[in-house]
């Protein structure tokens, strides 16, 4: 079972926590349908926002970049048996997870 997201401590400076997932899917439209159906559980687990990208020469190679309330919440979610089953049903092949702390952001 996926537990509710972790909240930053009151008064603590919020730093952005991100997860970068790179994976191949069997069929993008089928994967996207499962991804969209999981929106509520992703939000409940602590995902704040996301961005989906694909390789310019391979429509089934997906990059999922997301912001989380905490990396602990993200790890708990992505390692949960429930999500392993969702990935299997969605046709995900060998996902690579990169957990990231934001250190700087700027506009040019």
Protein language model annotation of sequence segments:
Residues 2-85, 89-108:
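Short S/T/G/P-rich N-terminal loop/turn motif that feeds into the first structured element of a domain
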């Amino acid at each position: 079972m996926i537990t509710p997201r972790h909240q930053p401590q009151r008064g603590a400076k919020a730093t952005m926590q991100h997860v970068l997932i790179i994976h191949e899917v069997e069929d993008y439209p089928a994967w996207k349908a499962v991804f969209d159906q999981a929106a509520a559980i992703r939000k409940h687990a602590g995902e704040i926002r996301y961005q989906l990208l694909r390789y310019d020469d391979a429509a089934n190679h997906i990059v999922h970049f997301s912001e989380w309330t905490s990396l602990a919440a993200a790890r708990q979610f992505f390692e949960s048996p429930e999500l392993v089953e969702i990935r299997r049903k969605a046709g995900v092949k060998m996902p690579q997870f990169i957990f990231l702390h934001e250190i700087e952001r700027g506009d040019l």
